C-alpha cells in the first residue's frame, strides 16, 4: 500500500499517478484497451521501482471500466473475458494444474465481502476429478476454493490458515480475491487490479496482516483486487486541493489571502485534515450507499473471468450445471 501524507491506495496505477508525468526509475507503464475498457500495465522492474512505488517487483495490471456502474451486461462479459485472458497470461497453467481460489475478507461486512462472494460462484472441480474421473475426464481442470474468514472471526491469521491448506492440497497456483482501497471515488467497483506479487489481507483499510505471497506459500500467487472504499483523508485532501485552486484563481495575486493560499504546504493541509477528522483520521473510510449491489455485480464479473480462465474446455451451460 502507498501512503503519502496519510493518503492511502492499494492500486499501483494510482501510485504511479502520484508522480504526475515524471518518469520513475525502475518502473515501466503501458496502456491499451477497447471500447469502454482501459487496461494499464505497470511493471516494477527493480529496487528503485520498489522504493518509489512502495510495492514489490512484479506485474500490476489494471482494468478500468466505468460503465460497470450502469449494469451493462455486454460490458460485464467483455470485462470478464479480458480478466480471463490476463489470468491465463500470468498463470501459464498446464491442463493438469490444480488451482486454489481464496476469497479473502469478512463476509459480515459488505465492502469487505468481495472475496467470499466471488468464491461462492467459482466452478469447483477437485472433488469431481478425484471421485468421478471417468465421467469428467480431461475437459475440466482441478479447482478448489474457500473463504478463510478474518482474524477477528477465527482468531487465526489468514496466511496461517492458507499455508495449512496449501501444504495439504498442494495446488500449483493460488488465486486470491480481496477488497482494496482507492484514492478516487470513480474507481470504486469499476476497477480490477491483477498482480503476481501476492497481497497483505486487510491492507485496504490499514489493517495489515501477514502477507500472502509465493515466498510464504511456496507456490505462485495471483492477487485480484477491487477498490470498494476510499479513505476519508483522501476525500478531505482532494477537497482542500480543489478549494485552494479555485480560490487562488479568483483572488488577486497581490492580496494577502492569495499569498496565504499559495504558501500553504502539504503538511499544513494534512494538519487541517487531522484536526477535522480527529480522532478517526487513520480509521475512517467511505463507501457508496449502494455497495451491496456493486459488490454483487462485480463479484459475478470476477468469478466469471476466473471460471473462463480456469475451465476453457467447458461451455457456459456446463459451468452453470456445476455451479448450481
From Swiss-Prot:
EC number(s) given by UniProt: 3.4.24.78
Prosegment residue ranges: 1-10
Molecular-function GO terms, alphabetical: metalloendopeptidase activity
Description of post-translational modifications: Autoproteolytically processed. The inactive tetrameric zymogen termed p46 autoprocesses to a smaller form termed p41, which is active only during spore germination.
KW Protease (keyword) present: yes
GO BP term (any one): spore germination
Highest taxon of source: Bacteria
Enzyme type, top EC level: hydrolase
Stated role: Initiates the rapid degradation of small, acid-soluble proteins during spore germination.
Name of this protein: Germination protease
Organism listed in the record: Caldanaerobacter subterraneus subsp. tengcongensis (strain DSM 15242 / JCM 11007 / NBRC 100824 / MB4) (Thermoanaerobacter tengcongensis)
Gene that this polypeptide is encoded by: gpr
